[in-house]
């Protein structure tokens, strides 16, 4: 089997060579000509997979080492009997930590307690559930909106309008869809944006077009007092410089780019291709690919508070650094793509080992994703 793989998919060569002959390729060079002669194509979300790419190819398997699939024409693949798989949930922890870190930053900067705020989570899939678990662990009030889940499980959640009316912070975790009963394209439109509470924090880590970026730009120009975090943008990688200049935090679609999340995606697609070709494979663990965190342990004493959690989060991921890099390099050629492809080896909170002399503090840290143990002082 000949396998063509995006060269930014971490540890892909060492795994996929167990199945067949591997060629690595830059994502910008993935086209109809260059995939000729290959049996399997392994990609990221930057590659659009459709009839134009595949119609004259011999590809029998497409694997996307990503949690989403809106870059893939799944219906066309089914029609043409091309097997497809992706890695839902692989980056759920990373995105949830990015969003939580954003909230902690605003709480620190603007001097408020998250315990006095209501967080509206729009979309209650893998990421929404992970984030909700972390926020609930520290006592933050959350309200949920997911009409598809609501109908499927016959449960009562909130409508989008109720989320807008009652939330101090709104975070979006929906796929990008254009049709059906609940399309999400421009879900957050001009009317919704105007209806947001003053000083509301709006966070988008889902897909750029879930928010009408032009309407967002205009209401920010007009002085609407909201705070905005965008990791995803309309027309990526050609994002709007004016919009970037008006929001609080802007990053180049890297919310899910933790080292652990990337490895989960690679392992997931490797397992899928093994199943497709009927090859038995051993179970791989993330720890097989990652060295221990560079800090052996962190010792903390006393009671837990919001500021301590924020400081711990900075050791793993300072999103202000990513914001700074995007603004600093914005005018460079292929800035957005290059920042994504050369992204630092960001670790998840679980990589931090924390010794605490407070058992309640230690238990709480574990609930929100850190690796903590209680040590009784002698």
UniProtKB/Swiss-Prot annotation:
It comes from the Bacteria. PROSITE patterns: D_2_HYDROXYACID_DH_1, D_2_HYDROXYACID_DH_3. Substrate binds at residues 45, 66. Its EC number is 1.1.1.290. One of its GO terms (biological process) is pyridoxine biosynthetic process. It catalyses: 4-phospho-D-erythronate + NAD(+) = (R)-3-hydroxy-2-oxo-4-phosphooxybutanoate + NADH + H(+). Pathway: Cofactor biosynthesis; pyridoxine 5'-phosphate biosynthesis; pyridoxine 5'-phosphate from D-erythrose 4-phosphate: step 2/5. Homodimer. This is Erythronate-4-phosphate dehydrogenase. It comes from Wigglesworthia glossinidia brevipalpis. The gene is pdxB.
């Amino acid at each position: 089997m000949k396998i063509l793989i995006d060269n930014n998919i971490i540890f892909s060569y060492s795994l996929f060579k167990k199945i067949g002959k591997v060629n690595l390729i830059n994502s910008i060079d993935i086209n109809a000509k260059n995939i000729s002669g290959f049996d399997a194509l392994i990609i990221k979300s930057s590659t659009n997979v459709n009839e134009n790419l595949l119609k004259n190819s011999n590809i029998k398997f497409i694997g996307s080492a990503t949690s989403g699939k809106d870059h893939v024409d799944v219906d066309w693949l089914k029609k043409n009997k091309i097997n497809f798989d992706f890695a839902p949930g692989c980056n759920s922890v990373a995105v949830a930590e990015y969003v939580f870190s954003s909230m902690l930053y605003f709480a620190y900067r603007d001097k408020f307690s998250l315990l006095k705020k209501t967080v509206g989570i729009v979309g209650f899939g893998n990421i929404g559930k992970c984030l909700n678990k972390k926020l609930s662990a520290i006592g933050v009030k959350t309200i949920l909106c997911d009409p598809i889940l609501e109908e499927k499980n016959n449960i009562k959640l909130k409508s989008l309008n109720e989320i807008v009316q009652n939330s101090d912070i709104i975070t979006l975790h929906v796929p990008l869809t254009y049709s059906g009963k609940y399309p999400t394209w421009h879900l957050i439109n001009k009317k919704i944006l105007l209806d947001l509470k003053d000083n509301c924090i709006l966070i988008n880590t889902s897909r750029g077009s879930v928010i009408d970026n032009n309407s967002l730009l205009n209401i920010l120009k007009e002085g609407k007092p909201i705070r905005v975090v965008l990791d995803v943008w309309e027309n990526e990688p050609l994002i709007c410089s004016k919009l970037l200049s008006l929001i609080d935090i802007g990053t180049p679609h890297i919310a899910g780019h933790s080292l652990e999340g990337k490895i989960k995606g690679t392992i997931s697609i490797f397992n899928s291709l093994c199943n497709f070709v009927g090859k038995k494979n051993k179970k791989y663990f993330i720890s097989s690919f990652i060295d221990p965190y560079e800090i052996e342990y962190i010792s903390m004493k006393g009671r837990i508070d919001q500021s301590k959690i924020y400081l711990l989060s900075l050791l793993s991921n300072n999103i202000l650094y990513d914001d700074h890099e995007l603004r600093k390099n914005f005018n460079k050629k292929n800035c957005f793509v290059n920042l994504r492809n050369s992204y630092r080896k960001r670790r998840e909170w679980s990589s931090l080992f924390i010794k605490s002399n407070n058992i309640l503090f230690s238990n709480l840290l574990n609930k929100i994703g850190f690796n903590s143990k209680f040590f009784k002082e002698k």
